[in-house]
């Protein structure tokens, strides 16, 4: 099992998500819950396709931190 960093963004019609360690792996939906489910499925499908094509599957390398600043 691997844990990939997923960036979620608000859009005009809902939410979008992408995985920096898996270029091209994206999802979008009208709700956050649906976007989470779709990006999970997209990651699994993306990795499965890479394995079928004999491509190396990248290990997760990115992480996110939130830093509080007083401005």
Feature map (PLM): residue ranges:
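Short aromatic-glycine-(Arg/Gly/Cys) micro-motifs in beta-strand/loop hairpins
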Residues: 7-19
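Active-site micro-motifs of SAM-dependent methyltransferase domains
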Residues: 13, 24, 45
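Structural detector for hydrophobic anchor residues on beta-strands
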Residues: 4, 15, 25-27
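Proline-centered helix-kink/hinge sites
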Residues: 20-23, 58
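Short, surface-exposed helix/turn micro-motifs that flank interaction/cofactor sites
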Residues: 18, 36-37
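Short, charged, surface-exposed hinge/linker loops at domain edges
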Residues: 1-5, 37-71
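A short, exposed loop/beta-hairpin motif centered on an aromatic-Gly-Thr core
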Residues: 23-33
């Amino acid at each position: 099992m691997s844990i990939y960093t997923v960036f979620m963004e608000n859009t005009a019609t809902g939410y979008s998500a992408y995985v920096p360690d898996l270029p091209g792996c994206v999802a979008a939906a009208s709700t956050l819950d649906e976007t989470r489910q779709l990006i999970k499925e997209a990651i699994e499908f993306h990795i499965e396709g890479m394995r079928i094509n004999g491509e190396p599957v990248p290990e997760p390398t990115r992480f996110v931190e939130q830093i509080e600043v007083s401005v």
